[in-house]
Amino acid sequence: MKFFVDSANIEEIRELQNLSLVDGVTTNPSLILKSGRNILDVIKEICTLIEGPVSAEVAATEFEIIMKEAAILAKIADNICIKLPLTLEGLKACKALAAQGLKTNLTLCFSANQALLAAKAGATFVSPFIGRLDDCGINGSELLHEIRTIYDNYGFETQILAASIRTVNHVKEAALSGADVASVPPTILKALVKHPLTDKGLQTFLDDWKKTGQNIA
């Protein structure tokens, strides 16, 4: 499973990239707002750091305007992935952009039916929001399983990009569900390495090593 860091913060992305933990980046209007920067500037800078797909989201809901914004975003770099709302207009734009050879990410997916439509429209990625479903008392990981089954049944090539990840357990659930990608906030991505027994065991080894009085270097 690939990791796309969910951030528009250049320093956060650079730190994780230096650890070889980033296969791509996802952004959205909320993250752009949080960055305090112009969307075109920040997306361009991210694309200079990351070789994998960088999702940049349109701010339009009507087909013609979506296509205009997508054309502007697509010119930023070859690894741009146009992020679209999972609506009828978004599906129409997805089909048109896919015909142009552009990568697309249909976002705000909350049902298997929506994911089926995304695949039929030729989306590169579909983004089920598992955290927001959990907030509503619906099992988000179950949706991932449903989408995986449907895609495997019909040989769809659209990749499942698990989004709205709130916990390290969400990452595990995404992997167990067969998601192709997890869109993970930097704090969660770094937390994956943590386990209290690892810390405890390491401290024991360090204490014992100190008692040997030896040095390796």
Curated annotation (Swiss-Prot):
Its main location: cytoplasm. It comes from Bartonella quintana (strain Toulouse). Signal peptide: none annotated. It catalyses: D-sedoheptulose 7-phosphate + D-glyceraldehyde 3-phosphate = D-erythrose 4-phosphate + beta-D-fructose 6-phosphate. Keywords: Cytoplasm, Pentose shunt, Schiff base, Transferase. Transaldolase is important for the balance of metabolites in the pentose-phosphate pathway. PROSITE patterns: TRANSALDOLASE_1 (PS01054), TRANSALDOLASE_2 (PS00958). Pfam families: TAL_FSA. This is Probable transaldolase. One of its GO terms (biological process) is pentose-phosphate shunt. One of its GO terms (molecular function) is transaldolase activity.
